[in-house]
Amino acid sequence: MQLLKKRILQDGKCYEGGIRIPFIARWPGHVPAGTANDHICAFYDLMPTFCEIIGEKNYVKKYANKNKEVDYFDGISFAPTLLGKKKQKEHDFLYWEFNETNQIGVRMGDWKMVVKKGVPFLYNLATDIHEDNNVADQHPEIVEKMKTIIFAQHTPNPYFSVTLPEKK
């Protein structure tokens, strides 16, 4: 008898054990029972999804924080996926920052980079879901592309600081 070792995903905010969570929906007559999909979404996709479902087309203007000069709505509705439709817009990348662990995360397709205290670690989630093998040295072009995303997405904040990777 062969015993299978159950492996737990790494925890820590930007690792899969901290961000990979199932989304479960029940909506009789709309969401087909027993369906599953591999659509990747983020917390910030919830508002556009629910607004699309209720028919609110102008939610950015209606719900923007009036106390802010700029309020960001970066989410993409995943209502088409919930409703079983084929056309679903997807993110080019997902981006996270966690100041309490000094981590930044970027995901593009199967590639995921975690920057811990300024040091980049690159993983291919298609072959390494547990994020055991840092392949940053083997794929410097992907690391640089993801660093470009980090520098474009990061907004400095004195209350929530993270250490950015070195610029090339």
Spans of features found by a protein language model:
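Intrinsically disordered, low-complexity polar regions and short flexible loop motifs
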Residues: D128
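Active-site-proximal N-terminal segment of extracellular/periplasmic enzymes that hydrolyze or transfer
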Residues: N133-E141
